[in-house]
């Protein structure tokens, strides 16, 4: 359990680490230097994959021709949703017709994938298990939690971007966030045991709620050092949430057999990736609307003063 907690914690460190090192890389070589560094990290990771191979698991001939069809339909559906959610607030939802086409394509592809899987004797993904009340409850809970956690990655960064605060000024804040995530992961590694997942969910949600409440009083005078405590609480909650969710889900799947592992991975990846993008789209769109509203109010007041 401790190894799983630490491994999942490492997957959440990307954003704070990026915020810490990207200002220096941008100063050295601009976006070219930043992307070059990313390519270097990918090559190093690629080398480690071959230098430190995992133990080969037992292999069973399982993949069939229809599995490829189902996989392609699911991949296209998820990909279309991801692209639309990522670019919706940039091109704006009602201004770009192709965003609606992407959502329609996603619905068609995922519907076809469900139809194919329901009529197979050995499905790639067990749709009936995915639509069971227990699975829907689990998926809905972690999806909502993932949407809430997007407040930190989008809300705080876009807020300071709207205020004109540079990346260098937010580096101490993201250092605090990084330490809080690590603290959450270490807490899970030390205390998380089967049957304790709900306590971790409750603690994570309480931390996020308290942090969001503290941030609700932010104004145009708020600076990064003013929200270190609140963002640390949100980060600590995110560090508690992911290992507990994976531990609870995997524990139930392993008892049912290895056939359900792929179905669980599909649910987990969907809720985490699509949930994160959905949260970013919701918070980003809200910030865009409120920013435009306040700009219009300021423009009207300026015009009234000029006329008066």
Model-derived features with residue positions:
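12-transmembrane solute porter fold
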Residues: 123-293
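Cytoplasmic-side transmembrane-helix entry/capping segments in multi-pass membrane proteins
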Residues: 3-9, 63-72, 128-131, 198-205
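Alpha-helical transmembrane segments
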Residues: 32-42, 97-107, 227-236
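Membrane-helix boundary/linker segments in multi-pass transporters
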Residues: 50-63, 83-170
């Amino acid at each position: 359990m401790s190894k799983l907690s630490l491994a999942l914690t490492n997957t959440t460190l990307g954003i704070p680490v990026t915020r810490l090192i990207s200002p220096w890389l941008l100063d050295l070589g601009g976006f070219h230097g930043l992307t070059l560094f990313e390519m270097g990290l990918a090559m190093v990771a690629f080398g480690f994959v071959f230098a430190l191979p995992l133990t080969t698991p037992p292999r069973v001939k399982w993949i069939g021709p229809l599995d490829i069809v189902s996989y392609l339909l699911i991949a296209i559906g998820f990909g279309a949703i991801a692209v639309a959610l990522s670019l919706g607030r940039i091109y704006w939802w009602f201004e770009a017709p192709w965003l609606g086409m992407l959502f329609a394509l996603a619905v068609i592809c995922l519907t076809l994938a469900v139809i194919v899987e329901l009529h197979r004797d050995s499905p790639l993904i067990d749709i009936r298990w995915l639509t069971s009340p227990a699975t829907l409850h689990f998926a809905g809970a972690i999806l909502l939690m993932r949407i809430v956690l997007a407040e930190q990655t989008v809300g705080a960064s876009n807020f300071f971007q709207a205020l004109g605060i540079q990346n260098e000024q937010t580096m101490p804040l993201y250092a605090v966030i990084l330490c809080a995530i690590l603290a959450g992961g270490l807490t899970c590694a030390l205390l998380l045991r089967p049957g304790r997942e709900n306590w971790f969910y409750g603690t994570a949600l309480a931390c996020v709620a308290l942090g969001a409440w503290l941030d609700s009083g932010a104004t145009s005078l708020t600076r990064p050092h003013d929200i270190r405590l609140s963002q640390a609480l949100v980060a600590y909650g995110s560090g508690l949430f992911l290992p507990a969710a994976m531990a609870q889900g995997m524990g139930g799947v392993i008892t049912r057999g290895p056939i359900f592992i792929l179905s669980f991975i599909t649910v987990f990846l969907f809720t985490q990736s699509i949930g994160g993008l959905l949260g970013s789209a919701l918070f980003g769109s809200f910030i865009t609307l409120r920013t435009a509203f306040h700009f219009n109010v300021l423009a009207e007041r300026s015009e009234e003063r000029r006329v008066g």
